[in-house]
Each structure stands twice: as C-alpha cells, then as structure tokens.
Amino acid sequence: MTVEQREASRLGPLFDSCRAENRAALIGYLPTGYPDVNTSVRAMTELVESGCDIVEVGVPYSDPGMDGPTIQRATEAALSGGVRVRDALTAVESISKAGGRAVVMTYWNPVLRYGVDAFARDLAAAGGHGLITPDLIPDEAQQWLAASDEHGLDRIFLVAPSSTPERLANTVAASRGFVYAASTMGVTGARDAVSNAAPDLVARVKAVSDIPVGVGLGVRSREQAAEIGRYADGVIVGSALVSALGDGLPSLRSLTEELAAGVRQRNSP
C-alpha cells in the first residue's frame, strides 16, 4: 500500500485499530430491501450493535451473476418489493448514525444509471466509507477512480485465485481501504469448508502491498471466522447472515455475535 492509499483511506483507521487488537475486522453483508426496506435497515444496525466492524450494504440487481442462491432469492424479494438505490443510501445513513462503518456493494449498472459522480457524492453525504464493485475492473473504472478521489471514498476491487500476477498487482494498486479476496471461484455462498485457495490468494496480495485484505465467499461459523482471521485482515460474511435474517432479527444478532467472537479468537487453537 502506498502512502497515498493509506492517508486517503477512510477505513484505514479501523483496520489499524483491529491490528492493534491482534484481530481481523468482521465485515457483514445484507441486501437492502430484504425482507422489506425498514427491516433491512434495522438488521444492518443490528449488525453494528452485535459487533460487526464494517457493514456491506447491498444494492439488489436483476442480474446478480456472482451471487449464490441465498442472496439471489433475497435480492429477488427486495426487487419485487420495489427497493431503490436511494434506499441503500438511507441504510448507509442509519448505519453511520448508529456508529458503524458502511460500504455499499453493488454491480456497476445501477451506479451508471444513477450517475457515477452523483452516486459518490450522495454516498459520501450519507456517511458511507466506500464502494465494493464486484463486476468492475480498474481498467474500466476511470469515472469511479475520479469520483472516489473527489468525494474521499474507498474503492474496493475484487481479486480471485484466477487473477494473473499483472491483473492482481493492478487491482491492488487501484484499491483503497481493502482488497476483496474471493476465496472460492464462482458464485458466493455459505459453505461447510472454506476454500484452501484463500491463504494463497492473501499471500499473493501481501507480496505486492500491505493494503488490508478481506476474505469472503463461504464463512458461516465462529470457527471459520477464527480460521480466516488468522491470515486475513477482514472476514467477510454474506449468505449466512442473509439466511439468519430469514429466521428473524434475534437469529441474525446471535450469529453476528458468534462471528464477532470468532475474529477475536484468531490466536486460539
């Protein structure tokens, strides 16, 4: 990570604080509008109150090519309920008011429709810290690179085991805040066994930068959170939290507290 990346990052202080506590950050994802807008916003503030360090606010999209079945079902329900991009910004504002840190996770098309600079402006105004863009590569991100600089937002790009050394280095150099390491190939979703490719991918990023690395796509338990927290800077959980929310807010709260305990036991056997 360059000096510029470190100084400009809105999430940098959070990762510094977690490092000082010798633990990984817990990063939780929920889609806006599931099961309805108000409940989804309440659920996201529950994540904050239950120990989630960063909340990924999902923008439902009609063609979610990288999402597993759990998240696809939730986003379809949200879209059927009429969720809008503006609702995601409302969620960001609520998370910020609750003392949390929010990043938006969205496919690129909704941002283009909204207007790239306008979206960055409104996200920053809502208290957002940055944007995760799973289907946008830095080579095609000139508008977003400019808008994120203009409005002081972190930009979180994805790397995968299939990333070539050149692509990985370019992606890491363009990222700010953290890099999202997809620990399994293909779509996301909770799995019983976390991919063995994840430690290797984190090591590849660490070989070219000291930017924080978040690992996602598979975590569902306290034990898995602890396992990933031993080598990653952030443990990303999505599908398991969406499933828990389907069982109600108490279930979501319980799982989040378990995961928060998991990232804090990274040095335990």
UniProtKB/Swiss-Prot annotation:
Keyword Lyase carried by entry: yes
EC number of the protein: 4.2.1.20
Pathway: Amino-acid biosynthesis; L-tryptophan biosynthesis; L-tryptophan from chorismate: step 5/5
One GO cellular component term noted in the UniProt record for this chain: cytosol
Enzyme class per UniProt: lyase
Reaction equation(s) it catalyzes: (1S,2R)-1-C-(indol-3-yl)glycerol 3-phosphate + L-serine = D-glyceraldehyde 3-phosphate + L-tryptophan + H2O
Active site: 56, 67
Keywords noted in UniProt: Amino-acid biosynthesis, Aromatic amino acid biosynthesis, Lyase, Tryptophan biosynthesis
Highest taxon of source: Bacteria
GO molecular function: tryptophan synthase activity
SUPFAM superfamilies for the chain: Ribulose-phoshate binding barrel
PANTHER family, per database record: TRYPTOPHAN SYNTHASE ALPHA CHAIN, CHLOROPLASTIC, TRYPTOPHAN SYNTHASE, ALPHA CHAIN
Subunit structure: Tetramer of two alpha and two beta chains.
Function statement: The alpha subunit is responsible for the aldol cleavage of indoleglycerol phosphate to indole and glyceraldehyde 3-phosphate.
Family affiliation: Belongs to the TrpA family.
HAMAP family: Trp_synth_alpha
Entry-linked NCBIfam families: trpA
Protein name: Tryptophan synthase alpha chain
Recorded name of the encoding gene: trpA
